[in-house]
Amino acid sequence: PASAVSASVAADLVARAVSERPSACAAHFVFANNRLLHAETPALPEGAVCVPIAEALASHPDLLRPHFLRHVDFLGGDKFAALHAASTLSGIFVHFPKGCVSTDPVIVHHFVGGDGAAVFPHTLVVAGEQASVSVFDLFESIDGDEETLIVGMTDLDADHGGRIQYAGLQDLSDKGAKHVQLQHTRAGRDAAVKVGFVNLGAEWVRNESINRMVDKGADCQIFSANLANDVQEYDQRTLQSHEAQHTTSDLLFKNALYDGSRTIFSGLIQVQPGSHHTDSYQTCRNLLGSDEAEANSMPGLEIDADQVKCSHGSTSGTISDEEIFYLRARGIPAEDARKMISLGFLHEAVEKLDGEPLQDFLFARVERKFAAIG
């Protein structure tokens, strides 16, 4: 459903991706319309596997098959998951075995273009015992206002003491592009997984994030910063499932909305029977930059265990006149003042991710989006 790009376009996309990548990297892959355009592994640790999904099916089937397309639970996105499973052609398999550690991220660019183009990238990350890996996905449009569709899936599996950080940036065209991202986490004993999403583009977005803490000491942190304007709609569904004693999780979603944009947040903390001594937190905060913007939040709790500490909540508000007055008194125009306050509002979520180069890259994209908002 997506045509290959020309050689000249491919060269331009690779040059763009390499020049814009946020930091030194363990590996870098560039896909356009499901085709692999570029691959390099300048600092991949010994023993690590980092290859396209299609290659992994042939070269590392024993490592891939226990994890690939194994999830059957979704938060309403079952039909998208079935479409993805039937159509996925691109994406990356990252496997860090026991004790394998890298401080540099694996960076994957996914470009889509051509009217009616659809791509189905899959990111599968496995961290063995005491391994540590970071992966950064970027989703971008090749051209302008074309009708395109991305249905992606991200699966994260951290074994005993494993560490995974996953960040996803969606910066597609806000005219015609639609993006669905279905993410699953399985955190084992004493494992730590950190997941971050930044949504800036696309006309319509559906994010589902299911995070399961399945053994003692597991921890998941989930963060999202979203900037919507015009008629963009961001639909976010989350599940924090505590399935063992002494597990922890923390979720922070922040949405800044302008014009007639709309966000939906539906999140659930679920503490399974016997999962005592759980600590879990869920917060969604919405900043409304116009009277027409609409933010809908539905946080929830289901607790079937004793001796737990859980909280959930959501707030929605506008920028106060006092804040604007304070900045205007210091020579800052009112519109610039509003953008500064909104930038600071979103920064709290972005800075939760590890790695200053990654934070700087994401925040620069947020600033670029603000500059484009009239």
Regions of interest found by a model, annotated:
Residues 1-34:
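Short, Gly/Pro- and small/polar-rich lid/capping loops
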Residues 39-49, 53-332, 346, 350-374:
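Conserved beta-strand/loop scaffold segments within soluble protein domains that form the structured core
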